[in-house]
């Protein structure tokens, strides 16, 4: 009986691991699909290109620094990145309907959350702020971001700002 329970536990753990691994992969594949879709709008392409760039940066920096990160880390970052970008779009639209000043406030909340929650403390500010410094982008966020912390901060501040 103990062997059966232990076997079931191992099986459940491996299934959970496979499901968790797929979150990062799913976010990445979904973004790639939109970027490569000739029917996608410029807005959709730009937003999903940012997601790909941010995920590539994350992976590159983990490898470059020889860090050991588990699948939970990558999955959490990918899901929080997606939630961050989606909530930004929704809250920016809500703010736009209130006033130009409120729109600017929401934009600053999200941009600051990405800039002031670094994951790697990368000194190459030109690279990590390439989207922040691009005044035409729909995703003015820093690449060197801990997306879980940034999402928590931005969500809390945006909710208060939009009351």
Pin down the residues of each PLM region.
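Surface-exposed, polar helix/loop patches in the mature regions of secreted/periplasmic/lumenal proteins
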Residues: 74-163
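A general secondary-structure boundary signal
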Residues: 3, 18, 39-42, 163
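Bacterial Sec-dependent N-terminal signal peptides
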Residues: 1-24
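Compositionally biased non-globular segments, especially hydrophobic aliphatic-rich helices
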Residues: 16-19, 57, 62, 157, ...
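Charged, low-complexity interaction regions
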Residues: 36-46, 63-72, 95-100, 118-119, ...
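Immediate post-signal-peptide N-terminus of mature secreted/exported proteins
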Residues: 21-68
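Intrinsic low-complexity, intrinsically disordered segments enriched in polar/basic residues
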Residues: 3, 21, 68-69, 84
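Short, charged, amphipathic alpha-helical segments
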Residues: 44-53, 71-75, 103-108
